[in-house]
Curated annotation (Swiss-Prot):
Taxonomic classification: Bacteria, Pseudomonadati, Pseudomonadota, Gammaproteobacteria, Alteromonadales
An annotated GO BP: regulation of division septum assembly
The keyword Cell division is assigned to this record: yes
Coiled coil: none
Keywords in alphabetical order: Cell cycle, Cell division
Organism: Shewanella pealeana (strain ATCC 700345 / ANG-SQ1)
Superkingdom of source: Bacteria
Gene: minE
Designated name of the protein: Cell division topological specificity factor
Function: Prevents the cell division inhibition by proteins MinC and MinD at internal division sites while permitting inhibition at polar sites. This ensures cell division at the proper site by restricting the formation of a division septum at the midpoint of the long axis of the cell.
Family label: Belongs to the MinE family.
Residues spanning the membrane: none
């Protein structure tokens, strides 16, 4: 890396690439909801309520997904965007 490379402005990602990534996330989320068991929405809500007891997060900061694999087992994926600590 040369010294000039350090001072160059960094290019922001292309908006088309960003839109494509967001669309892929939405499609994957909707696909997961179709295959989820009947109890999944209630379980998801209860998990979010437990997290809110300890951390102030909005509903858009918590992602709960259930993935079915070919090996006859399920994977529950939970992503929480935690607020910055001051």
């Amino acid at each position: 890396m040369s010294l000039l490379d350090y001072f160059k402005t960094k290019k922001e990602p292309n908006t088309a690439v960003t839109a494509k990534e967001r669309l892929q996330i939405i499609v994957a989320h909707q696909r997961g909801e179709r295959e989820a068991p009947d109890y999944f929405p209630q379980m998801k809500q209860e998990i979010i309520e437990v997290i809110r007891k300890y951390v102030q997060v909005g509903p858009d900061q918590v992602s709960v997904q259930l993935e079915q694999t070919d090996d006859n087992f399920s994977v529950l994926e939970l992503n929480v965007t935690l607020p910055e600590q001051n």
